[in-house]
Amino acid sequence: MKNLDKNIDGKSYANKLLKKIFPLSQEYFYKFNRKPSLAVILIGEDPASNVYVKNKIRTAEANNIKSIEIKLPTETLEEELLQKIVSLNEDVEIDGILVQLPLPNHISEQNVINTINPDKDVDGFHPVNFGKLYMGVPNFVPCTPLGCLYMLKNELKHLSGKNAVIVGRSNIVGKPMASLLLSSNCTVTLTHSKTKYLKEHCKKADILIAAVGCPEMIDDTYVNENAIVIDVGINRVADPLQNKKSMLVGDINYKKVYNIVKKITPVPGGVGPMTIACLMHNTIKAAYKNKKYNFIDILEDST
């Protein structure tokens, strides 16, 4: 049984954030006579993507956010998808647009992201939003790094001066996470597959964030006893205890690392719930911006 004293409970933090979001969505409804709205586009029948979309829609509906699910077949042409996005951009009743990734191989992910109106880009992947994040004037921040930062601020209270090491340099997690931590006055090391002496970098971390997509890659030889570990990885592997069944593991070897570090996010139940909660935050923010209404960001005060 997991000792909850060392676990960072992502579900609890997500619920804490959603409790702040729900009254904002109600206030929006009373002011503008409609719910904030989120359009979610799903292409194909990928089982994992279907689960993620269902979770997002369920959370939206539970928080008084209207969700519009648009399912398209795998063979949908890129031009057809781009035209659908353009129509959603022009629809004043749509506040946020999300295209579930990954996409079929014949569709350019970057072309799709570039087509979304930056003010409706609740995933925070558009180059305009990336640029604003790096300039220190963020518009929409990618949901997973935003959720990680929320948990870190609650766990540590003060991030200034902390050594933060990120394993993985993707546009979805690694790079925006580095920018957020730099803005919080951390000393940031962004590592990747070509980094030399990776263990030595990780061993020095006050904050270690794993987002490399390699099951249980980081073990007890990578960490120190004062580290706060955030495991972004979601990997499905064979369950050694149950024949023909699978299980979810992170990029951290939880069993080996748990007894050493100060705090750690489990998989599942760590980063995942916060990612969805931050998507709801971005959708509410987009809805208020759509109405040119002042939005006081509830994440500015994370405690």
Description of each model-found segment:
Residues 2-8, 12, 273-303:
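C-terminal helix-to-coil terminal segments
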Residues 60-74, 188-190:
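Short beta-strand elements in bilobed, periplasmic/extracellular small-molecule ligand-binding domains
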